[in-house]
Amino acid sequence: MTTFVDRVELHVAAGNGGHGCASVHREKFKPLGGPDGGNGGRGGDVILTVDQSVTTLLDYHHSPHRKATNGKPGEGGNRSGKDGQDLVLPVPDGTVVLDGAGNVLADLVGHGTSYVAAQGGRGGLGNAALASARRKAPGFALLGEPGDLQDIHLELKTVADVALVGYPSAGKSSLISVLSAAKPKIADYPFTTLVPNLGVVTAGETVYTVADVPGLIPGASQGKGLGLEFLRHVERCSVLVHVLDTATLESERDPLSDLDVIETELREYGGLDNRPRIVVLNKIDVPDGKDLAEMVRPDLEARGYRVFEVSAVAHMGLRELSFALAELVATARAARPKEEATRIVIRPKAVDDAGFTVTREEDGLFRVRGEKPERWVRQTDFNNDEAVGYLSDRLNRLGVEDKLMKAGARNGDGVAIGPEDNAVVFDWEPSVTAGAEMLGRRGEDHRFEAPRPAAQRRRDRDAERDEAQQEFDGFEPF
């Protein structure tokens, strides 16, 4: 059964925003309580967060569909809906997030680094928030916005300081098992290692990690063997260690040709030219292996490599190797810029989102694109005439109608707001200039303009009293 997965496709859905509430305050002896509809809650985000305790993407291989909770709708009495709960998905350190086209969206390195893969929708405003001096009792509320839907790919690139590379059965797993406490599978046949193994090595005051990469063969960079699947795990390593088999039984192979083949594959893969290299001649406990190591060592040193003769089985030469690796790792760490865990947002919001465009398409349709118009359309309940009128007023104030006229739109032309796959299309009817004033104030409650009964009765009594007083003052006795 598969226990290690380093590449998955993930389908994430953020929560939808809750709808706003349209309600009027009702209380005894308060006939004009006014609007008191609360706002809807925000939908939950889907967040990828690096967790050091997670080492594989196996969970997302089995269940690739993940969804955050929706925001709750607002209620009367100025009660706002509850926000949806964010869905936090733990991922291994070194996870790369890509879109469907293969573009890198985020590179998550460092414990706690987070990435918002899908943003929750905003909650709709209740009618209490929409009330104004001109619109005193709105009979509508705004709808909550839908959450983001994203299809993303996750790739794990192991975060290690040292990578052991070499032919299958060169002794890489044996070497990492004696340098660290790792317990990889070890056997005397090729491709025993099917997944990268990580081990932690302590050399003096330096602690570093070593990755045992599955064996490489000629053509690995083009997908032969297992190389293409796991070469990306070498990308983050600071030091490359060539593990060469000095006791191979294959007559056409020798340490120098093995080194040339592996270097060719690394060069074809790309991006690894500046990594420092160390050559390890393994299996010197075998008599023929010791002799071969002494023969090829001068040639390797002439090429500029630091060479170490070791035996993972007999534990020979390991201390010198571990301290040499620690020195190179410390140098690489000192030269590396400090990385801080940051919360990455998939689409940063612009400070000014008031811009929009109007284009005329070949079929005569006018298309409006812009953050505000598209958001307003998503928030509108088209079953409510008052809400549609409110949308018309907002678009008019933004200048959409002016641009439509300049683009050549006429009464009855088709207008679409939004992208082709999710647009609202309607027949355009130009509004009257200052339409809100000419057509009446939408959402106005005329009871606010009428005199209140108690005040009217008080005025009537005062008028009767004044009239009686005047009659009394003008009374002349016989």
UniProtKB/Swiss-Prot annotation:
Chain ranges of the Obg domain: 2-159
Record family assignment: Belongs to the TRAFAC class OBG-HflX-like GTPase superfamily. OBG GTPase family.
PROSITE patterns: G_OBG, GTP1_OBG, OBG, OCT
Gene Ontology biological process terms, A to Z: ribosome biogenesis
Function: Plays an unknown essential role and a regulatory role in sporulation. Overexpression suppresses sporulation although cell growth rate was not reduced. Impaired differentiation was eliminated by addition of decoyinine, an inhibitor of GMP synthesis. Overexpression has no effect on undecylprodigiosin production, but decreases actinorhodin production. An essential GTPase which binds GTP, GDP and possibly (p)ppGpp with moderate affinity, with high nucleotide exchange rates and a fairly low GTP hydrolysis rate. Plays a role in control of the cell cycle, stress response, ribosome biogenesis and in those bacteria that undergo differentiation, in morphogenesis control.
Protein name, as recorded: GTPase Obg
Bias (Acidic residues): 469-478
Cofactor: Mg(2+)
EC number annotated for this UniProt entry: 3.6.5.-
UniProt subcellular location: Cytoplasm; Cell membrane
Entry GO terms, CC: cytoplasm; plasma membrane
Chain positions recorded as GTP binding sites: 166-173, 191-195, 212-215, 282-285, 311-313
Regulation: induction: Expressed during vegetative growth it disappears during stationary phase and sporulation (at protein level).
Renumbered residue ranges of the record's region Disordered: 60-88, 438-478
Phenotype on disruption: Essential for growth, it cannot be disrupted.
Biased composition (Basic and acidic residues): 439-450, 457-468
